[in-house]
Regions:
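Gram-negative bacterial Sec-dependent N-terminal signal peptides
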Residues: 2-36, 623
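Outer-membrane translocation/initiation segment of Type V secreted surface proteins
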Residues: 4-7, 392, 409-584, 657
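N-terminal segments that cap or nucleate solenoid repeat domains
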Residues: 34-78, 82-83, 478-481, 485, ...
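Beta-strand-rich solenoid/repeat architectures in extracellular/passenger domains
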Residues: 39-41, 45-51, 58, 62-70, ...
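Extracellular beta-solenoid/beta-roll
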Residues: 51-52, 70, 74, 280-285, ...
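Right-handed parallel beta-helix/beta-solenoid
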Residues: 56-61, 74-81, 94-106, 116-127, ...
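Glycine- and acidic/polar-rich repeat regions and solenoidal domains
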Residues: 153-155, 214, 218-235, 240-245, ...
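Membrane translocator/pore-forming domains, dominated by Gram-negative outer-membrane beta-barrels
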Residues: 156, 228, 263, 271-273, ...
């Protein structure tokens, strides 16, 4: 141990009979000698080999502990304590391991302190870097009434000019509770700030059995207290992560930034007030969260709601998942989010252009109450069980005025959709309703689309499953040139007038996309014998292989006069005979199909669209027998398909389908004459198709349960085919044809959305006219192509084209 001094002689202690011999020994020391551990305007260094002692520093002394260990250190005035790879252990009856006062300075690097670090006001400075502070209950003084890790407090003389500062830089602090009895504000406290400022940064961790950080102004003139937590963690046990006790009028500025974490044992990130606070002390608490995600409540106890303010600001992608209780002002901006986990109340709510307030997560429904609201383009997110007027929903209640503009997003929380009257109340305004709230994205429930309306009578904002119609211009201004006056002698008596305030419910286009997919699924595998045989149904020698490509576009009638459906189908079929019998009259074979459908459902009312997609394939077998006049055919197929529905602004929905489809077909050909070298035949045909489809029950991302209805049943086709047969100059057989078909569908397609059925208005009767030609070459190759148009009930239209190639050997 090295010791130096500039003191001429030690100050003699007061004599006492019991210590007389000790005093005589001290008096005999040479001038300039100092007791080890007691520094007065002196410097000392403690190394690893030096004895473990307690130290006291005054009058600008300096103590350096480099790799060594000491007991209690007390430093005052302008003294400096440097700890480097050192250890300080509380001993004896001392409450703390290190006690600083006046303008003393403590700098610790990579050191361990067993016991509290106490700062007794003044302009003291503490910097703990990469160090450890541990307050272990087992090592506390018997009968101790406090356990605090780092304590910036006031015990002695106070001056309003004093601003002690504490920096925890990459430092770990752990504080236990007293075994008995634990106290609310003096035991298990990670850090206490009564005066001055504290920075907890660079990965520091403060773990406390009670409160993580406690701020309490002890004096009327304590000034502003500042706590900054940057890239660090503050964890509490039985108390709040941060507690403010407003004993006297003070300002508290608290910032949590740069990915910091607050882990609140009692669920409160920040609590202002509670036991021990002094009634009547006006307090301003400013809580800023900057680029950090926190989970817990921010609370101003009701006793202080009228005697202080708690102001919360979220900035720079910050997020709080929790409640705001009695918050005076909340500002949400800078891509920040407040996700409410329960009912909350705020005095002045300001929502910036990139801020979001989510009133809940859909598990429960919450109410946010604000005295005033100012919107600057941010977003309010509501969870609503979309149904009728009585639907459960998150709600914003503004007791005073609402100004500015904000967007509203609505997520369906399992609502089945229903017709509304006045609507589902989202926003209630008690004062001047000057704010504009715009629905962002879409609100859908069941088969219905919802829209946001401002009610003219109360200024509130409601969701309605209806679309406001444009007013009649002649009602607005009867003097317009196009407005003819009604003859008062012969007035028009309108029948079943439509209430313009409450029009009918609006269907969402996704409902049409589901129906279009169902229609396509039923049609994708349908075919007849001539589709496989390249247009021929007569007996022929040899084994035949074939391939066919076709494409069809269908336009279905409007669903409920709102949704217009277009379905484009295409497929590739391949097959080959595997057996031929009865001199070529009979044959059996196998086939495969790859098919897809793309559908569009468009709402003329809203302008929204949805797209449907069906993709898949099938394997099947067939068998037929034919003569030059009669043919009979049977086939069976098993298919599996993947379905998708994608609506504007909504998540993509996926579900699967499978089906069995079987067919029986027969026809008989009559010779009716000849034109030149071309023989004419007329052939009536009859086909029965049975479809057994199974589509998964699907739950959408918004909670709507979608189920197929009536997608299995028997359908039929009756046709009449006029065909000519002749030969070209090259010797090929050319057979032009014209076919008229009548299709009758037995199944009534439909889908249920949360058990509310909706039919696609697919026509039961369709009428087709198809024309084409088949060419048989001498080489055994044949080819055919055709084009057809179809009309059906309710304005259904369809066009189809096909190309087939077959080869026999």
């Amino acid at each position: 141990m090295k010791l130096s001094s500039v003191v001429s002689s030690p100050r003699p202690p007061t004599p006492h009979r019991l210590f007389r011999s000790l005093l005589l020994a001290l008096a005999s020391l040479p001038a300039g000698a100092v007791l080890a551990g007691d520094l007065d305007d002196q410097t000392a260094e403690v190394g690893a080999a030096d004895p473990i002692e307690a130290w006291s520093l005054i009058n600008g002394s300096q103590l350096t502990v480099n790799g060594g260990q000491t007991q209690h250190i007390r430093a005052g005035d302008t003294s400096v304590v440097n700890l480097q790879n050192a250890r300080v252990v509380r001993t004896g009856l001392e409450r703390e391991a290190i006690y600083l006062y006046g303008e003393a300075t403590l700098v610790a690097n990579s050191s361990r302190i067993d016991g509290s670090v106490f700062i007794d006001s003044g302009n003291t400075s503490v910097t703990l870097k990469d160090s450890i502070v541990v307050v272990d209950a087992a090592q506390l003084v018997p009968g101790a009434n406090s356990s605090i890790g780092v304590d910036a407090s006031i015990l002695s003389t106070w001056d309003s000019q004093f601003t002690p500062s504490v920096v925890l830089d990459g430092t770990y602090v752990r504080v236990d509770d007293l075994h008995s009895p634990p106290r609310p504000f003096t035991t298990g406290i990670g850090a206490r700030l009564v005066v001055g400022q504290m920075d907890i940064l660079n990965g520091s961790q403060v773990v406390a059995a009670n409160v993580g950080a406690l701020l309490m102004g002890e004096r009327v003139d304590s000034g502003a207290l500042r706590l900054d937590i940057n890239d660090s963690t503050l964890q509490s046990g039985r108390g709040a992560a941060i507690q403010v006790i407003p004993r006297f009028a003070s300002t508290y500025n608290i910032t949590v930034a740069n990915g910091s974490h607050l882990i609140a044992g009692d669920g409160n990130l920040l609590r202002v007030g509670r036991d021990g606070a002094v009634s009547g002390s006006f307090t301003d608490v400013n809580f800023t969260v900057d680029d950090a995600r926190l989970s817990g409540d921010v609370r101003l106890d009701s006793l202080f709601a009228t005697m202080g303010s708690l102001n919360v600001a979220l900035r720079n992608k910050a997020q709080i998942d929790g409640r705001f209780i009695n918050v005076t002002r909340a500002e949400i901006d800078g891509d920040s989010n407040w996700l409410m986990t329960g009912d909350s109340n705020v005095g002045r709510l300001s929502l910036g252009s990139t801020g979001t307030v989510a009133l809940g997560n859909g598990s429960t429904f919450n109410t946010l109450t604000a005295d005033t609201f100012t919107g600057n383009g941010g977003t309010l997110l509501f969870n609503t069980m979309l149904g009728d007027d009585s639907s459960l929903t998150d709600k914003l209640v503004i007791n005073g005025d609402a100004n500015g503009q904000a967007n509203v997003r609505v997520l369906n929380a399992g609502g089945a959709g229903a017709k509304t009257d006045k609507g589902i109340e989202l926003i209630r305004v008690g004062g001047a309703s000057n704010a504009q709230f715009d629905l962002q994205g879409r609100a859908v429930g069941g088969q219905y689309e919802y829209f946001l309306f401002k009610d003219a009578s109360d200024g509130g904002w409601y969701l309605r499953s209806a679309l406001a119609g444009a007013p009649d211009p002649c009602v607005v201004d009867p003097t317009l040139p196009e407005c003819r006056p009604i003859d008062p002698v012969d007035p028009v008596n309108p029948i079943d007038p439509i209430d313009p305030i409450n029009p009918g419910p609006v269907l969402r286009p996704e409902a049409g996309a589901y129906l279009a997919n169902q229609f396509a699924l039923d049609q994708l595998l349908r075919h007849g014998l001539r589709d496989r045989q390249g247009g021929s149904a007569t007996a022929a020698d040899g084994v035949r292989g074939w391939t066919r490509v076709d494409a069809t576009q269908s336009r279905l009638s409007a669903v409920e006069d709102q949704l217009y459906l277009r379905v484009d189908r295409s497929r590739l079929q391949l097959g080959a005979d595997v057996g031929v019998f009865d001199n070529g009259r009979g044959r059996v074979g196998v086939m495969g199909t790859v098919a897809q459908s793309s559908a569009t459902s468009h709402s003329e009312l809203t302008g929204y669209s949805a797209r449907g997609k069906v993709e898949g394939g099938a394997l099947g077998v067939y068998g037929n027998w034919s003569t030059d006049a009669l043919y009979m055919d049977a086939s069976a197929q098993r298919g599996q398909f993947r379905n998708r529905v994608q609506g504007d602004g909504l998540a993509e929905e996926r579900y699967d389908s499978d089906l069995w489809q079987s067919s029986l077909e027969a026809g008989y050909r009559f010779n009716i004459g000849q034109i030149g070298s071309t023989a004419l035949t007329l052939q009536p045909e009859l086909q029965l198709v049975y479809t057994d489809a199974n589509t998964d029950v699907h739950s959408e991302a918004n909670g709507t349960v979608v189920r197929a209805l009536g997608d299995s049943g028997l359908s039929g086709r009756a046709g009449l085919r006029l065909q000519g047969e002749g030969r070209s100059a090259a010797g090929a057989s050319v057979s032009p044809y014209v076919v008229a078909n009548w299709y009758r569908d037995g199944a009534s397609n439909g889908m249920a959305f949360d058990e509310e059925a909706l039919n696609a208005s697919v026509p039961r009767n369709r009428y087709e006219l198809n024309a084409g030609a088949r060419v048989d070459f001498r080489t055994g190759l044949s080819a055919s192509s055709g084009f057809g148009v179809m009309r059906g009930d309710h304005g259904c239209r369809e066009a189809t084209a096909n190309v087939s190639v077959a080869y026999k050997w």
